[in-house]
Amino acid sequence: HIDVVAGAKLEELKAIMQRRLAEVAAGDRSEVPEYDIYPKELTAPYRDYRFQIGEDMYARLGIPRDDKAARMKWFARNYQSFGAPMALFCSIDRRMGPPQWSDMGMFLQSVMLLLREEGLDSCAQECWSLYPKTIGDFIGIPSERMLFTGMAIGHRNPEHPLNALRSQRAPVDTFTRFHGVS
C-alpha cells in the first residue's frame, strides 16, 4: 500500500516531525518502532559496511566523528525529505511475512527505477519507520497494516557532495558462488 504526500500536506507533515523530534530530544520515548531496521547484534561484515558508509558520508559533509550534534542535525533532514517536494510511504499488511517484505523491497526498487526513467530522483528512507504512530496517524494507516518505509521524491542537487558519494563495493566473490559457470 502506497501513500504519496506533497504540497501543503507534506509541509504539515514536516512541521509535525519537527515537533516530534523536539519531543524525542527532550526525552519522550513513548513511540517505538514496530521492527528493528538492523539486527540488535549486527556482526561483521555488515556492521563494518554500515560503519564505513556512515564515515564516508559524514566526511563528505565535513562533519567530524565527535560532532554528534551536527550528525543528528543532518540525520533529522531525513524527516524533511531532504527538501524533496514529494514523499512516498509504504505500509504492509501485518499478516505478511519475510517473502512479502522482500516483494515490497523489489516493488520499491522498481518504483525508484521508473522514477529515474521519468527524470526524477528518489531516496529510500527506512528511518521513517522509527515513527510508525506519528506517520500512521497522519496518513491514516489502518491498524491491520504497519509502516514499512518512506521515500523522498524530487530532483537531486548535482552539486551536493553526497550525490557524488559511491559506497565501497565488496568483491563479487565475497558474496557469490558460481556453479557450472565458466
Features from the language model and the residues they span:
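Acidic, surface-exposed loops and disordered segments
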Residues: 1-182
